[in-house]
Amino acid sequence: GIFSLVKGVAKLAGKTLAKEGGKFGLELAMCKIAKQC
């Protein structure tokens, strides 16, 4: 039902984030370390 739909969307979003978020995640980590988010 809805739960499996949400799970599917989350999985797809996770894949997209993993692809797109490589450099963004690095920037985010750096800004968290520098505490300047």
From Swiss-Prot:
**Gene Ontology biological process terms from the UniProt entry:** defense response to bacterium
What are the disulphide bonds in this sequence? C31-C37
Recorded hits in Pfam families, A to Z, give:
Antimicrobial_2
For this UniProt record, the keywords arranged alphabetically read as follows: Amphibian defense peptide, Antibiotic, Antimicrobial, Disulfide bond, Secreted
Per the record, what is one GO cellular component?
A: extracellular region
* InterPro entries given in the database record: Antimicrobial_frog_2
Q: State where it is primarily located.
A: secreted
Tissue distribution of the protein: Expressed by the skin glands.
Q: Which residue ranges does UniProt annotate as crossing the membrane?
A: none
> Subcellular location, in the record's words?
Secreted
Function summary: Antimicrobial peptide.
The text of the family note is: Belongs to the frog skin active peptide (FSAP) family. Esculentin subfamily.
Q: What is this protein called?
A: Esculentin-2Rb
Write down the species: Pelophylax ridibundus (Marsh frog)
Lineage summary: Eukaryota, Metazoa, Chordata, Craniata, Vertebrata
